Amino acid sequence: MRILVLNGPNLNLLGRREPDVYGDVSLKGLAAELMLRAPEDVELTFKQSNHEGDLIDALHDAFDYEGVILNAGAYTHTSIAIRDAISAIAAPVVEVHISNVHARETFRHESKLAAVCIGVITGFGLTSYTLAMHALIEHWRNRHD
C-alpha cells in the first residue's frame, strides 16, 4: 500500500515555528517517526510545498497511491482549488492538523476540504499523522477484503 504524506505552507518550519503550538520535532523528524510506525507493507512518500499549485499538482499525481494524508496548513480554510483536486482523484484523503484548530482562532474553525475527505484528525500533535495512516490502512483493508 502506498500513502502520500503531503504537507502545505509553513510546515517546513516544524520544530522552529511556534513550538508551543506545533512541537519541537522537525518535518524530517516527523517523516522518520512515521516511517518507523508504518507497517512493512506500507510505503510512505513525503512532499511539502508552500505553494498552492504545487500541492494541487501533487494531489493530481496521487492517482498511483492508495491514500493521502494531507495537512494543507492555512490553505485548509481558503482553497477551493485544493478541494477540487481532492475531489478529482480516486485516492481517499485524510485531512490532518497538528493543533486543535477548533480551539484556536475562529477563522481556523472552517475547513474547505473536510467535506471531500474521508475524515479529519486534529489536535493530537504529530500523532495526528500516525492516526491518519492507520485510518487509511483500515479504510483500504475494509475495501479490499
UniProtKB/Swiss-Prot annotation:
Transmembrane region(s): none
Keyword Amino-acid biosynthesis: yes
One GO molecular-function entry: 3-dehydroquinate dehydratase activity
Catalyzed reaction equations: 3-dehydroquinate = 3-dehydroshikimate + H2O
Positions that bind substrate: N71, H77, D84, I98, S99, R108
Site (Transition state stabilizer): R17
Pathway given in the UniProt record: Metabolic intermediate biosynthesis; chorismate biosynthesis; chorismate from D-erythrose 4-phosphate and phosphoenolpyruvate: step 3/7
InterPro entries documented for this protein: DHquinase_II (IPR001874), DHquinase_II_CS (IPR018509), DHquinase_II_sf (IPR036441)
A Pfam family recorded for this sequence: DHquinase_II
Function: Catalyzes a trans-dehydration via an enolate intermediate.
Family membership noted in the UniProt record: Belongs to the type-II 3-dehydroquinase family.
HAMAP family: AroQ
Quaternary organization: Homododecamer.
Protein name from the UniProt record: 3-dehydroquinate dehydratase
Organism annotation: Exiguobacterium sp. (strain ATCC BAA-1283 / AT1b)
Gene behind the chain: aroQ
